[in-house]
């Protein structure tokens, strides 16, 4: 079920969630990959988590 929900997520939410959860990258590393800040990565990850929770309910 989680894979279907992840597949539906738009970028960059999908990629950020994937990198953080499965790639075990820090928010600083994720931000650097996207040429963004650590805060951007953190906010994007938490928004993705909210979207996933809503889809799973």
Segments the model singles out, each with a brief description of its role:
Residues 21-22, 46:
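Short acidic-aromatic loop segments in the C-terminal HATPase_c
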Residues 33-57:
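DNA-recognition helix of helix-turn-helix
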Residues 16-20:
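A short pre-motif secondary-structure segment
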Residues 1-4, 14-15:
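Pre-recognition alpha-helix immediately N-terminal to the DNA-recognition helix
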Residues 7, 11-12, 23-40:
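Helix-turn-helix DNA-binding module
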């Amino acid at each position: 079920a989680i894979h279907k929900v992840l597949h539906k997520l738009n970028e960059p939410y999908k990629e950020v969630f994937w990198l953080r959860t499965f790639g075990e990258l820090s928010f600083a590393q994720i931000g650097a990959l996207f040429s963004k800040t650590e805060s951007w990565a953190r906010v994007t990850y938490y928004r993705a988590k909210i979207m996933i929770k809503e889809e799973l309910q």
